[in-house]
């Protein structure tokens, strides 16, 4: 069998498999993807992946600075964190001290912003 015969056979198999696959994925496309519930300013706990003996599994709470549909940027951690690795922290009672405030400064470049930390 030549290369052309193999490619034609592969194309025939692809045609047979394509329609059932397209129908299966069409059902999933009808359901909207729901992003995580976290918003800027929320407080979250971050999962600690490697815990030592008697060490808590969650660290924080941290304040959410930026969000994407799948990840969060939190105060105090340089890397972005996937939304599956955080959970919401309970809100502190009224009248308790809060964390620092943050100010967003835009630049000429639409892909750059500057975050500055203010006094609590």
Swiss-Prot record:
The keyword Calcium does not apply. It is an enzyme of class 2 (transferase). GO terms for molecular function: endonuclease activity; RNA-directed DNA polymerase activity. It holds the Pfam family MLVIN_C. InterPro entries: MLVIN_C (IPR040643). It catalyses: DNA(n) + a 2'-deoxyribonucleoside 5'-triphosphate = DNA(n+1) + diphosphate. Its EC number is 2.7.7.49. Keywords: Endonuclease, Hydrolase, Nuclease, Nucleotidyltransferase, RNA-directed DNA polymerase, Transferase. Residues 90-109 are annotated as: Disordered. Residues 90-101 have a biased composition (Low complexity). Transmembrane segments: none annotated. This is Retrovirus-related Pol polyprotein. The gene is Pol.
